[in-house]
Each structure stands twice: as structure tokens, then as C-alpha cells.
Amino acid sequence: MADNIPGDLKYTREHEWARVQGTSVVVGVTQHAQESLGDVVYVELPKVGSTVTEGKQFGVIESTKAVSELYSPLTGKVVKVNDGLSDNPSTVNTDPYGAGWIVEIEPSDPKQVDGLMDAAAYTALLQNS
């Protein structure tokens, strides 16, 4: 398995990761996504308290190369956003699985996480694309 794909996270086909943290799920973009985007210059975040829907856009990430939509891996309520990205959006590039997280969602059904890909499935997706 690739070193840059943490085994303790879940993944989406849109190259986002999800980490269960208590009753909520922290979401960010993968190493692959940030490398494809290039230097991130802006991240549009949803409002805390807003509802996000699985597979639907919840934000935008802009880089020197492209503007890409961010899609929610789960349906639920946004309980926290990474306000630090307003001043330092490049944190998505330098620490995508840590300080570069994007939102924290309280899922309406915690079992939704089980439907996401594990690291092995995500690695296979990357190898086949």
C-alpha cells in the first residue's frame, strides 16, 4: 500500500478522506487530490450548522491550476470548519491528512462511513485510473 494513503481512514472516489472522531467525522482531501490540484490558494467552506448531503457539493477548493468542487462523503450537519484555511489554504498541500482537514460532520447515520472505501480499495482506484 502506498505510504501516502493512511490505513486508518476511509476514502471517496472524489479523492476525499474521512476520519471517525467520536460521534463526528473529519473530512479532507487526499494527498493525490492536493498533488493534482497544485498550490491551493483558496478553500470555500460551508457554514457551521449547515446540512450536507452525501455525494453533493459542500464547498470549493481553488488552486493555481484549477477550481474543484468538494463533495460530502456523508449526509449530516457541519459541526466544525477549519477556519485556519482562510489565512493558510496551502495547509491542504503541506498536511492534507492533518492540519489541512476541511470540515467536521455529525452524520445523520454513522453507518454511512461503512460504505466508503478503505485504504486498499482507494489504492486500487488510483492504480486503475
Swiss-Prot record:
It holds the Pfam family GCV_H. Its cofactor is (R)-lipoate. Residues 24-106 form the Lipoyl-binding domain. Binds 1 lipoyl cofactor covalently. The modification N6-lipoyllysine is found at K65. The keyword Lipid biosynthesis does not apply. GO terms for biological process: glycine decarboxylation via glycine cleavage system. One of its GO terms (cellular component) is glycine cleavage complex. Signal peptide: none annotated. Belongs to the GcvH family. PANTHER family: GLYCINE CLEAVAGE SYSTEM H PROTEIN, GLYCINE CLEAVAGE SYSTEM H PROTEIN-RELATED. The glycine cleavage system is composed of four proteins: P, T, L and H. This is Glycine cleavage system H protein. It comes from Myxococcus xanthus (strain DK1622).
